[in-house]
Amino acid sequence: MAKSMYAYVREAWKRPDRSEVKALLWERLQTWRREGSIVRVEHPTRIDRARSLGYKAKQGIVVVRVKIRRGGRRKPRYTRGRRSARMGMRRLTPAKSLQRMAEERASRKFPNMEALNSYWVGEDGRSKWFEVILVDGHHPSIKSDRNLAWLANPVHRGRAERGKTSAGMKGRGMRTRGRGTEKTRPSIRSHANRGK
């Protein structure tokens, strides 16, 4: 059976450092570094990934590229007296992934839209870039779409902030079930944060 165009795109993005994507990214990152932290884009950079996550080229759907810093928490040094070990500066791992943070920022920037999903598009030594698919649940073309009409329901408000996207579910430990996951449901906080 003949491969589709999406299959070739997916294959190229599987190992971007070993395919023709490497040269493309090298050029793109030079432009992206000079841009703002949240930029609306005309077309998804990875069309195969976007479509597999629910993207459709229609009104009411927008793709934004979000730049986010790499690394752990960057906390300011305390000026009050305490031992250096108790300053809470080093080895503080955030409970959220950078992808979740990117989704939340995009969602806050476009308050009338909900984050459907997101995917990685590039990184360098200092930053990571994610593209977030945003959907306006009250747009007529979305309301009449049987695959996306559920977003109009008020229970789906603030999806990104409540960890309901794919990246959010992963960060909350919802990808695994059964033995060893007793403290992840109904939520991490309900078990005094012992689930992670």
Curated annotation (Swiss-Prot):
Cellular component (GO) terms are:
cytosolic large ribosomal subunit
* Positions of the UniProt region annotated as Disordered: 158-196
InterPro entries given for it?
Rbsml_eL15_core_dom_sf, Ribosomal_eL15, Ribosomal_eL15_arc, Ribosomal_uL23/eL15/eS24_sf
SUPFAM superfamilies listed in its UniProt record = Ribosomal proteins S24e, L23 and L15e
Q: Where is the composition biased (Basic residues)?
A: 186-196
Keywords assigned: Ribonucleoprotein, Ribosomal protein
Organism of this sequence: Methanoculleus marisnigri (strain ATCC 35101 / DSM 1498 / JR1)
- Gene Ontology molecular function, alphabetical: RNA binding; structural constituent of ribosome
On the tree of life, the source organism's domain of life is: Archaea
Name the GO terms of the biological process aspect. cytoplasmic translation
Family to which the UniProt record says this protein belongs: Belongs to the eukaryotic ribosomal protein eL15 family.
Q: Return any one Pfam family short name.
A: Ribosomal_L15e
Q: What is this protein called?
A: Large ribosomal subunit protein eL15
